[in-house]
């Protein structure tokens, strides 16, 4: 049950507000080509690409440690993080929705997983002119840190309804807070979690525009309070 109060919105970034999937693939390829051109036509290219991909996803295995050491030495990883923001694209309506929510007096927080590169998420946000769109930017390292930071937010705003928008519904399975509306943004890269559809405080949307309709519904439910 969502209770009355000023609404706080928590938005994931990659996959929710911006489409970074193609950007990752393009930046990886160009970074390797620019820093280690000798491997482009060799059998090593696939290993270099996979090692770099696993590294930035935080899933590097021992098998690729040697390759990563070379990628660091050649400046490939640095080049990737320099290139990546150029290719990130906003999802339709993303900025308009964020700006409209803030214009309505809502608190809008970026709440997303940190990149493997420390501070990488904030760097990306600043280079894509997203950082200042939010009232606050919070990043977390894994599930335990996510839950800790969510709890800290709840302690700051104990009586206010939260709306958490994310393309990764698996994160929602850890959240038992009944004053948080969990909104899954549909993504071709993420699977549904069947159990969530049984919860009253869960919704799935196709377009970010639907957030504005949800906000209007919450305002009406709260007695027309628009602040």
Language-model-detected regions and their locations in the chain:
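Short hydrophobic segments within beta-strands
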Residues: 12-13, 111, 165, 183
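Short, acidic loop-to-helix structural element flanking the phosphoryl-transfer center
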Residues: 82-110, 147
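Structural recognition of alpha->loop->beta junctions
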Residues: 125-141, 196-215
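A metal-dependent, Asp-based hydrolase signature
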Residues: 37, 47-83, 100
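Acidic, Mg2+-coordinating phosphoryl-transfer loop and its flanking beta/alpha structural elements
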Residues: 163-204
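Substrate-recognition "cap/lid" segment bordering the active-site pocket of phosphatases
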Residues: 109-163, 173-177
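Active-site neighborhood of HAD-like aspartate-dependent phosphohydrolases
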Residues: 1-46
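Short amphipathic alpha-helix with an adjacent loop that forms part of the alpha/beta core around
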Residues: 149-156, 211-224
């Amino acid at each position: 049950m969502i209770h009355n109060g000023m609404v706080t919105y928590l938005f994931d970034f990659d996959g929710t507000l911006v489409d970074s999937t193609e950007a990752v693939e393009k930046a990886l390829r160009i970074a390797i080509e620019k820093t280690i051109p000798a491997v482009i036509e060799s059998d090593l290219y696939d290993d270099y690409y996979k090692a770099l991909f696993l590294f930035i996803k935080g899933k590097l295995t021992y098998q690729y440690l040697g390759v990563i050491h070379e990628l660091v030495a050649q400046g490939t990883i640095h080049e990737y993080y320099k290139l990546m923001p150029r290719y990130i694209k906003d999802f339709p309506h993303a900025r308009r929705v964020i700006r409209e929510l803030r214009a309505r007096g809502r608190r809008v927080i970026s709440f997303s997983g940190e990149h493997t590169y420390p501070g990488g998420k904030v760097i990306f946000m600043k280079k894509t002119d997203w950082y200042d769109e939010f009232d606050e930017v919070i990043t977390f390292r894994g599930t335990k840190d996510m839950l800790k930071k969510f709890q800290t937010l709840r302690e700051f705003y104990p009586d206010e309804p939260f709306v958490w928008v994310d393309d990764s519904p698996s994160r929602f399975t850890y959240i038992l807070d009944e004053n948080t509306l969990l909104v899954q943004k549909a993504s071709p890269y993420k699977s549904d979690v069947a159990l969530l559809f049984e919860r009253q405080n869960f919704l799935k949307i196709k377009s970010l525009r639907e957030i504005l309709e949800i906000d209007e519904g919450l305002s009406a439910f709260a007695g027309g309070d628009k602040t």
